[in-house]
Amino acid sequence: AFSGILAEADIAAALKACEAADSFNYKAFFAKVGLSAKSADDIKKAFFVIDQDKSGFIEEDELKLFLQVFSAGARALTDAETKAFLKAGDSDGDGAIGVDEFAVLVKA
């Protein structure tokens, strides 16, 4: 899903680092997976991969399954992780993360 944007080895390393429940940290994940260093264009491409229902927003249910977008065998985020991730990214308080909010979150 991320071919041409992210390296498989980086994805594997980033997922391994947050295998344990409640160990997910979006800043660490985006850095390890190599997304923080990418161009605005690549970050946008990644957003549209994560936006599974193509609504133009990443909603709470999509955040919960965020890691599984990177690898089908990955765990779901815990409720606490999901809520913290949403709170960090949803700067306008509409309950979802838009493409511009996502870009800010990745570079945070």
Curated annotation (Swiss-Prot):
**Positions that bind Ca(2+) 2:** D90, D92, D94, A96, E101
Q: Where does Ca(2+) 1 bind?
A: D51, D53, S55, F57, E59, E62
Q: Which residues carry this modification: N-acetylalanine?
A: A1
An annotated GO cellular component: cytoplasm
Coiled coil segments of this chain: none
Q: Which residues form the EF-hand domain?
A: 38-73, 77-108
Q: Which UniProt keywords apply?
A: Acetylation, Allergen, Calcium, Metal-binding, Muscle protein, Repeat
Instruction: Read off the SUPFAM superfamilies from this record.
Output: EF-hand (SSF47473)
Give the protein family.
Belongs to the parvalbumin family.
What is the documented function of this protein?
In muscle, parvalbumin is thought to be involved in relaxation after contraction. It binds two calcium ions.
Q: What more does the record tell us?
A: Is regarded as an important allergen. On the 2D-gel the determined pI of this protein is: 4.14, its MW is: 11.53 kDa.
Q: What is this protein called?
A: Parvalbumin beta 3
